């Protein structure tokens, strides 16, 4: 698995966590098996008794769908920004003015 594949898988795992409640059971199952359980297309196709192409199409469409949700709702983007600010805050505990700036930025995200 290449670096880009790993980054995409990690991103899809986060997007799945944030948006799975908006998906159908079939969409959830396919994404979970593919990205979280690391099943191959063939294994998923065998499990659900469908073609590999059907699995591939569903995963691609569902991936596009969660990316669309993210572009509109930005839950993952805000999560990443909060995580970054928390780390910066930990590093600036001895710098009150800088810490205040980070707290302000964090409050603006809410």
UniProtKB/Swiss-Prot annotation:
Spell out the InterPro entries in the cross-references.
Answer: RNA_pol_sigma_r3/r4-like, UPF0122, UPF0122_fam_protein, WH-like_DNA-bd_sf
Q: What does this protein do?
A: Might take part in the signal recognition particle (SRP) pathway. This is inferred from the conservation of its genetic proximity to ftsY/ffh. May be a regulatory protein.
Q: Which family does it belong to?
A: Belongs to the UPF0122 family.
One Pfam family assigned to this protein is UPF0122
Transmembrane portions of the chain: none
Q: Which NCBIfam families match?
A: PRK00118.1-2, PRK00118.1-6, YlxM
Q: Which PANTHER family match?
A: UPF0122 PROTEIN CBO2450/CLC_2298 (PTHR40083), UPF0122 PROTEIN YLXM (PTHR40083:SF1)
Which Cys residues form disulphide pairs?
Answer: none
What name is this protein filed under? Answer: UPF0122 protein SE_0911
């Amino acid at each position: 698995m290449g670096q880009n594949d790993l980054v995409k898988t990690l991103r899809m795992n986060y997007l799945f966590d944030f948006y799975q409640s908006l998906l159908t059971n079939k969409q959830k199952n396919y994404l979970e098996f593919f990205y979280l359980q690391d099943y191959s297309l063939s294994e998923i196709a065998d499990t659900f008794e469908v073609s590999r192409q059907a699995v591939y199409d569903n995963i691609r469409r569902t991936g596009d769908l969660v990316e669309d949700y993210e572009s509109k709702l930005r839950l993952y983007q805000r999560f990443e920004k909060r995580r970054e600010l928390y780390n910066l805050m930990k590093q600036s505990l001895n710098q009150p003015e800088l810490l205040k700036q980070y707290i302000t930025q964090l409050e603006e995200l809410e």
